[in-house]
Structure formats: C-alpha cells, structure tokens
Amino acid sequence: MTIDAPELLEKLKISDADANGADIPGSTSAAANGMLKEDDDSDDDVAENTPAVAAENGTAKKKKNKKRKPKKKQPKVQTDPPSIPLSQLFPNNTYPKGEEVEYKDENRYRTTSEEKRHLDNLNSDFLSDYRQAAEAHRQVRQWAQRNIKPGQTLLEIANGIEDSARRLVGHDGLTEGDSLIAGMGFPTGLNIDNIVAHYSPNAGCKTVLAQNNVLKVDIGIHVGGRIVDSAFTMAFDPMYDNLLAAVKDATNTGVREAGIDVRVGELGGYIQEAMESYECEINGKTHPIKAIRNLCGHTILPYSIHGTKSVPFIKSNDMTKMEEGDVFAIETFGSTGSGRYVEGGEVSHYALRGDANRKDLTLSSARSLLTAIKKNFSTIPFCRRYLDRIGQEKYLLGLNYLVKSGIVEDYPPLNEKQGTYTAQFEHTILLRPTVKEVISRGDDY
C-alpha cells in the first residue's frame, strides 16, 4: 500500500496534536464512535476503558472495579400439565403437611405428650414419603379437574394423569423395578355413571366422556410403597350437584369422626346418616341418595392398597377399633339406585396375591409374565396398559392362567343398576401418635 505526501503530512500533524492532548476538530471518542460494547454499563467494560477515558480527560484517576452481585435464582414453578419432579420444587425433601387434626376426648393428651412426639419423630422417612406422594396427588388431580372435559377419550384422560404422576415422582417405570421406587399406586379409575369402581381403560378403548356423564376419578400414587389413595367426582350438568354434595359430605364426616379407638361399625353409622340425608332430582324425578352397602373403606399397607381393616358406609356391629399407626382410605360411594353393586364387564385391574402359594406353572408364558409382574409391580395393582408399557406382548393367555391359578387376583368393574348414577369421594388419613393427618387434603376437597 502507498501513501502520498499530503496525506502523510496530515497524519503527522494529527499524531503530534494528539500527543500534546489537543482537541482535534471532527475527532470523536471511541464511545461516540460506537466502539464500546452494547452492554457498556457493565463493570468489566468500565474497567477496560478506564485508561482511555483518563487519557482523553488528561487525568490519572482510577476507577475501582465493582463486583457484580450474583442474581438470585428464581424458584421453579410447576408446568401445565405438571412435569417438573417434586424433588426440584422441594430440594430439601420437605413436603407440605396434610391437614393436621387434634384427637378428641380421652386421646386429647396425645397432642402434647412428649412420649408421643418422640414416636412421631421416629416416623420421619415414613412421613416424607407419604407427603411427597400426597403433593404429587394434589398437583396431578388439580390439573385433571381443570382440564377434563366432555369430548375427551378415557384413554387420553388416564394417560395424562399417569404420565404427569410419574414425572412428578421422578420414576417413569420403564426400567425393571423402577415403578417400585415410586409411581402409580394402582391403575387410575375412570368410572362413568352406574360403574362404581375398578374400571380403567384398556388399550384400544374408544369411550368418550359425554356432557351428561358423572365421572369418578380414583387416583393412587406411591413413594416407597406408601400409597396415597384419593378420589373425586366430576359432573358437567348441575342436576347432579346434590349427588356429589351428599357423597362429599359423607366422606368429610367419616374423616372428621375417624380416630384412634373409634369403632368402625359406629363410624359407618355417621357416614350413612350424612349421605342419606340428601336427595337428588334428575330429569324431573327425585331420588334418595343411598350409601352403597357392600363396599367399604380400608386400611392401606406398604405396597398393598387393601389392608386388613374395613370401614363400612352403613352402621354395623363391627367392633374393630382404629389404632395408632393405622393408615386408612376413608372413601364413600353414593347411588341413586339400589345401593348395591354387582361385578361384571371387561377386566382391567389385577394384583399379585401376597398370600399365593407357589405352584409349578406349566405354561411358559405364565412363568415369564409372573417374573415381570414380581419385578415391576410386586403386590401393587396394575392394569393391561402397564404391561404394554414395559414391553409385554401376547400376555393375555398367561395372565388368565395366573388368575385361574390363584396367583394373580382380578378385579372386575363394580356396577350399580343400568340407568343409575353413582359418586365417590375419598381421602387417605394417617393416625399418627400425636395427631390425625388427612394427608391427601387439598384446596379442592
């Protein structure tokens, strides 16, 4: 590159003037020429440009570097549908408590007893698992209540609930044994109208929720085998409101009156009285609400949804007492029909029997299926869709063989008379040494 003489002379003049600190007409600072970074308010940029600024101003002042304050991390907020694991929302594994209710009468002392408090403190892992499962249940069911609408298939509803539940507890159940760490406590029940319980859609189910349906949604979620069992009913026509109100009142009555040393037969009387004080007018006809007599609430054991004690929905002579440490599913079912169910329909619910005798299985497909059931579900109830998820194929023959052999129990749907309507509400309660904790209680019910 060549430079002519006038141009060279001009450059020498500029250089000489710049060395003497003189202002040059038409010259600009680096900042004015846009040579600073766009984020020129950062402390690092100020520090880098300090010498140049000092030279321009003819000063020797130094600017101190200011350290940036680290930005505070914003707490994570749950997505819609729920997908962020609870371990990220509650990093200290301290999950919300359920509703704590002090015991009454002769058990009132338990609230302040040092001995009982000590026993309570020994249950920290037990309570943490239960509260995590309960928080997952609340978040999933509240999302479901906002989003279940007529026109959806039962398969869409079930898969949405179960996928969200698995994400929240951080275990998708696709690897061997993963669903035993945490996951579904039983198949999601989606029971329409006269179907009382134990129906979950099998693969290929085409049933669509209609505007005039009454839908019972029964969800179980477990962490470490601690199953939270809670249910609600949805209806989209206000003519069913009294049916839902009756059953919700009955369940809340059962929850309120339950406690250590309470006899279950007496508790059933309180439940029946609350429920059967209602009636419901449907299409111009008034129906008394009846408690379903041949169904019961139940205790919950680790990895087993049905324990050894039952809570009837009607008054009975059962003198069994509720005891410290018991976990109960207080559920009630009300009906506009006869108040009794019969079994019938396509089976979806199954469970490995804990008391089943070992037998030599001659059918090879039954042997391999039994191994998969033990490793993935143990005694937690499962459905056909869950077998599909873990890659089991052509298993129906082997499954039926296990049922006939008494190794696996099947649970057919429970049905009231055709043309009737039924509703369900349910909570899980812990009879802790110091208080009764309604572990599944939420703002919704």
Curated annotation (Swiss-Prot):
<feature type="binding site">
    <location>
        <position position="198"/>
    </location>
    <ligand>
        <name>substrate</name>
    </ligand>
</feature>
<protein>
    <recommendedName>
        <fullName>Methionine aminopeptidase 2-3</fullName>
        <ecNumber>3.4.11.18</ecNumber>
    </recommendedName>
</protein>
<comment type="similarity">
    <text>Belongs to the peptidase M24A family. Methionine aminopeptidase eukaryotic type 2 subfamily.</text>
</comment>
<feature type="binding site">
    <location>
        <position position="331"/>
    </location>
    <ligand>
        <name>a divalent metal cation 2</name>
    </ligand>
</feature>
<dbReference type="InterPro" id="IPR000994">
    <property type="entry name" value="Pept_M24"/>
</dbReference>
<dbReference type="InterPro" id="IPR036390">
    <property type="entry name" value="WH_DNA-bd_sf"/>
</dbReference>
<dbReference type="GO" id="GO:0070006">
    <property type="term" value="F:metalloaminopeptidase activity"/>
</dbReference>
<feature type="binding site">
    <location>
        <position position="298"/>
    </location>
    <ligand>
        <name>a divalent metal cation 2</name>
    </ligand>
</feature>
<comment type="function">
    <text>Cotranslationally removes the N-terminal methionine from nascent proteins. The N-terminal methionine is often cleaved when the second residue in the primary sequence is small and uncharged (Met-Ala-, Cys, Gly, Pro, Ser, Thr, or Val).</text>
</comment>
<feature type="binding site">
    <location>
        <position position="229"/>
    </location>
    <ligand>
        <name>a divalent metal cation 2</name>
    </ligand>
</feature>
<dbReference type="GO" id="GO:0005737">
    <property type="term" value="C:cytoplasm"/>
</dbReference>
<feature type="binding site">
    <location>
        <position position="426"/>
    </location>
    <ligand>
        <name>a divalent metal cation 1</name>
    </ligand>
</feature>
<feature type="region of interest" description="Disordered">
    <location>
        <begin position="14"/>
        <end position="115"/>
    </location>
</feature>
<keyword id="KW-0031">Aminopeptidase</keyword>
<dbReference type="GO" id="GO:0006508">
    <property type="term" value="P:proteolysis"/>
</dbReference>
<keyword id="KW-0378">Hydrolase</keyword>
<keyword id="KW-0645">Protease</keyword>
<keyword id="KW-0963">Cytoplasm</keyword>
<dbReference type="InterPro" id="IPR036005">
    <property type="entry name" value="Creatinase/aminopeptidase-like"/>
</dbReference>
<dbReference type="InterPro" id="IPR001714">
    <property type="entry name" value="Pept_M24_MAP"/>
</dbReference>
<dbReference type="InterPro" id="IPR050247">
    <property type="entry name" value="Met_Aminopeptidase_Type2"/>
</dbReference>
<feature type="binding site">
    <location>
        <position position="229"/>
    </location>
    <ligand>
        <name>a divalent metal cation 1</name>
    </ligand>
</feature>
<feature type="compositionally biased region" description="Polar residues">
    <location>
        <begin position="85"/>
        <end position="95"/>
    </location>
</feature>
<dbReference type="InterPro" id="IPR002468">
    <property type="entry name" value="Pept_M24A_MAP2"/>
</dbReference>
<keyword id="KW-0479">Metal-binding</keyword>
<dbReference type="GO" id="GO:0004239">
    <property type="term" value="F:initiator methionyl aminopeptidase activity"/>
</dbReference>
<dbReference type="Pfam" id="PF00557">
    <property type="entry name" value="Peptidase_M24"/>
</dbReference>
<feature type="binding site">
    <location>
        <position position="306"/>
    </location>
    <ligand>
        <name>substrate</name>
    </ligand>
</feature>
<feature type="compositionally biased region" description="Basic and acidic residues">
    <location>
        <begin position="97"/>
        <end position="115"/>
    </location>
</feature>
<feature type="binding site">
    <location>
        <position position="218"/>
    </location>
    <ligand>
        <name>a divalent metal cation 1</name>
    </ligand>
</feature>
<feature type="binding site">
    <location>
        <position position="426"/>
    </location>
    <ligand>
        <name>a divalent metal cation 2</name>
    </ligand>
</feature>
<dbReference type="InterPro" id="IPR036388">
    <property type="entry name" value="WH-like_DNA-bd_sf"/>
</dbReference>
<feature type="compositionally biased region" description="Basic residues">
    <location>
        <begin position="60"/>
        <end position="75"/>
    </location>
</feature>
<feature type="compositionally biased region" description="Acidic residues">
    <location>
        <begin position="38"/>
        <end position="47"/>
    </location>
</feature>
<dbReference type="GO" id="GO:0046872">
    <property type="term" value="F:metal ion binding"/>
</dbReference>
